[in-house]
UniProtKB/Swiss-Prot annotation:
NCBIfam families linked to this entry: PRK00110.1, PRK12378.1, YebC/PmpR family DNA-binding transcriptional regulator
Protein name per its UniProtKB record: Probable transcriptional regulatory protein TTE1135
Organism: Caldanaerobacter subterraneus subsp. tengcongensis (strain DSM 15242 / JCM 11007 / NBRC 100824 / MB4) (Thermoanaerobacter tengcongensis)
Keyword Lyase: no
One GO location term (cellular component): cytosol
Length: 243
């Protein structure tokens, strides 16, 4: 059950993206709109919405913005209709990249994403070209403390349906199937553990290490993609360097 953490190899990219406060509010708002549109405006019965709200609060998105986003999602407020679009492509040295976007104009976004790939050593691919290299999973992270017994936490996670458990430097990582992500998360919280991160994500089945030259090109491409206002998430299979 215990193993090496793939999440640790890719998450500092996420942290870097999250630090861009100027754009993160827009992305958080779109996440809430999408979740409310798909599952209704009650976070108690809509786990995706609950997760989106919690993440928004962690970044201090004002409550009125959260409520307005929920109402846009449920149709109580007007506004442009948002659609989720997935793009797949290749970066420098054949790296695999998946881009999740929420947009009110698919033609505009497709053109912008294609332009970013073309100008930064990448190629936009067809649907299904790289998704087979990834697994869609739930990731739950619990920070290590002196009071936590690793075996006890692992048993709680396993009994709730977790698929994998690993101990990394300073934290425990629990991997779940997306279908029982919320169930495992609630079991861990009920047992008294404090969760530091929890989300549905795409983890690469294998990661690759790039040469310094290719890595620099790859990082520039990822930064450009993440800077696009319509882009919500960018996933890849590159082993990241420490910053």
């Amino acid at each position: 059950m215990a193993g090496h953490s793939k999440w640790a190899n890719i998450k500092h990219k996420k942290e870097k993206m999250d630090a861009k406060k100027g754009r993160i509010f827009t992305k958080l708002t779109k996440d809430i709109i999408k979740a409310a549109k798909e599952g209704g405006g009650d976070p108690e019965t809509n786990s995706k919405l609950k997760l989106a709200i919690e993440r928004a609060k962690a970044f201090n998105l004002p409550s009125e913005n959260i409520q307005r986003a929920i109402k846009r999602g449920t149709g109580e407020l007007g506004g442009a209709k948002l659609e989720e679009v997935i793009y797949e492509g290749y970066g420098p040295a054949g790296t695999a990249i998946i881009v999740e976007a929420l947009t009110d104009n698919k033609n505009r976004t497709a053109g912008e994403i294609r332009h970013i790939f073309d100008r930064n050593g990448g190629t936009l691919g067809a649907a299904g070209s790289v998704t087979w290299m990834f697994d869609k999973v739930g990731v739950i992270v619990v920070e290590k403390t002196d009071s936590i017994n690793e075996e006890d936490l692992m048993m709680v996670a396993i009994e709730a349906g977790a698929e994998d458990f690993s101990a990394d430097e300073g934290e425990f990582e629990i991997i779940t199937d997306p279908s029982n992500f919320q169930e495992v998360r609630e079991a861990i919280e009920k047992a008294g553990y404090k969760i530091s991160e929890a989300e549905i994500t795409m983890l690469p089945k294998n990661t690759i290490k790039l040469s310094p030259e290719d890595y620099e090109k790859f990082e520039k491409l990822i930064d450009k993609l993440e800077d696009n206002d319509d882009v919500q998430n960018v996933y890849h299979n590159v082993e990241l360097e420490d910053e």
